[in-house]
Amino acid sequence: PKIKEEIFFLPDTSYFFQNATIEDMADFYSAYYPRYDRKRMTKLLGKISLDSKRKISTFSKGMKRQAGLILGICAGTRYLFCDETFDGLDPVMRQAAKSLLAYEVANRTFTPIIASHNLRELEDTCDHVGLLHKGGVLLSKDVEEMKENMHKVQCVIPDARDEEALLAELQVLQYEKRLSLLTMVV
């Protein structure tokens, strides 16, 4: 279907064909994504010194991440679904990846959807965050609003009835109890 031309998925564990090079993967993606931009790919790879003719299997985890992100961006899709995008990248490459995504958002119709367990990592990249829990949307807010209105609270409440009353009274997003220590995100 036509809609698949608008979506690229970048999984947590990058998958590339056995013995494939970045060029091989670009050939593959070009067949499915009519707006695949090889010139842009060559330019981006040159900026980070990744050899498009080297076997991807010889790359480090971070290099594979970079290759996957560049392949995904150059597919020219409207949406890029990313799972743990910045995992495995050193701090310099992490910032470069964030800058690349920001550039794409600013210069074309492009929306990255980034799944991460590290909310702090997303606060300077995303303007909207959704929290998923047990298959549902627990929360959907602007990052700034969320930072202003969310708090982590730790306390000890000796009486279980007081604990139940407190939990019923607050909007608790996350709750954990270890021995007598109660930790909540409200």
List each language-model region with its residue ranges:
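ABC transporter nucleotide-binding domain
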Residues: A97-V185
